[in-house]
Amino acid sequence: MYVHSSNLTDTISYPDVVINYRSWTKCTHFFGLLFDSRIIMLNFSIYSVSCFKYVMMNPYSFQTQV
């Protein structure tokens, strides 16, 4: 009876741990992707503004290079 109860708790607790671990990794993975996309968008906006400022400050720079 004691062995049966310990086996029962082991079989019940193990899938719960696996499910919790999977949902936790999925959640952190989602927030990691969200955080990465925000950093990429921030870098892209900064790059766009700096490129736009460069073109406005030097309007003939691209024409002279060609």
UniProtKB/Swiss-Prot annotation:
Superkingdom: Viruses
Protein name, as recorded: Uncharacterized 7.9 kDa protein
